[in-house]
């Protein structure tokens, strides 16, 4: 009986060592940048999807960022300020080794005059790995 238990424990140890070779991921930060056809944007709403999302933060002090974690795979972010094309905010993600597994969509845009943009087809979001300090 004791030999059977020891054998099963040994087998469990071997099976545990044979896990996924990709590991558990490398948590970190991705920078979310805006591509905009306009120069007078005042607010943008963005949805970011991917695994292991936890939070968002502004990049720099010239914008205000509000976010809501919908699930572990979706975060909704609203950014206010005198927005220009380029980095807007960062998101903490489950695996920065694969930024291509994360995506973002612009869902609404307002001009600095507070008027909603009717056409947001020229807007896009780009996610890149944050530079190490």
Predicted ranges, named:
Residues 1-18:
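Sec-dependent bacterial lipoprotein signal peptides
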Residues 19-133:
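Acidic, low-complexity intrinsically disordered segments
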